[in-house]
């Protein structure tokens, strides 16, 4: 059976707060993956998590921030800047923050599609939450 076409624009108000605290706006999905628009407000720090079953690809649209990720003895902090792309392979611990004055926005593709709120498992934070 053919998969229906889908076209979407991010909603003005977010659809859900992700388990890490970021604002999620739903975009199209197909059987192999789903897409969302993610926003982290200025001064915000996400909660550190790892995923149970999904890989993610991020593409930064606007704002600036930092991404911490760790997996199998590898660890790094990389800048999140417009037109940069980042991978979050299954089993990676990660956290991101927006120290800037503008919202940090990016598109996330999740493979397979995001299964629900229990997908993200809390891990120890790399950065403490803002006070």
Task: Indicate where each model-derived feature is located.
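A short, N-terminal "cap"/entry segment at the start of jelly-roll beta-barrel domains
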Residues: 1-37, 47-48, 118-131
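A short beta-loop-beta micro-motif enriched in histidine and acidic residues
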Residues: 23-34, 43-59, 73-74, 82
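Short hydrophobic/aromatic-rich beta-strand segments that constitute the beta-sheet cores
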Residues: 36-37, 67-69, 106
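Histidine-centered metal-chelating micro-motifs
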Residues: 45-47, 66, 84-86, 90-96
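Short acidic-glycine-tyrosine-enriched beta hairpin
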Residues: 72-90
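Ligand-binding loop in jelly-roll beta-barrel domains
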Residues: 81-82, 90-117
